[in-house]
């Protein structure tokens, strides 16, 4: 039996990454940012001069893609040829194309396998868009973190990103492979009128109570 896995899903700018990282620290679990994995593939595809919409070309480079996934302490890292990727993952070009890359079934299959490997030997808090529905469908600890479109748009603007929240939601929810959707047994957490501290306290208390 694998160690516990906490699944935190939600749309863009819902606050799920910050919440998941703090929950992991609270519990002493490893934090896994799956979005960084999809962003790394997106960045690499663009570096090769491949159009993200050219599905066959993207699929062709997957077997030899020089990305590796590890940890820095209790936080997951993504590396390209041994170099940890950082600002590359937050470039506007990466952000604009990650939904297209994430919709390719072969990309998702590759990364879901890597994501599950993290949980083979240690407990994890994993955030993304399909953690509770695809990666860990059997975990009892599922949370869907969201916020109003207006609040999320303001958060994106504060990060210096100019993409449309509505368009990103449409792409993530409409894709055929592992669309963004709330698991039937997940708890909905609306962060529109909550501070990060309140959200973390609510989820951490729920987890502690259920693990007791």
What are these model-derived regions, one by one?
Residues 70, 115-122, 129-138, 158-202:
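Small-molecule kinase domains that catalyze NTP-dependent phosphoryl transfer to phosphate-bearing small molecules
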Residues 8:
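Hydrophobic anchor at the beta1->P-loop junction of P-loop NTPases
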Residues 24-34, 47-51:
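Post-Walker A helix-loop "phosphate-sensing" segment adjacent to the P-loop in P-loop NTPases
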Residues 16:
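Conserved lysine of the Walker
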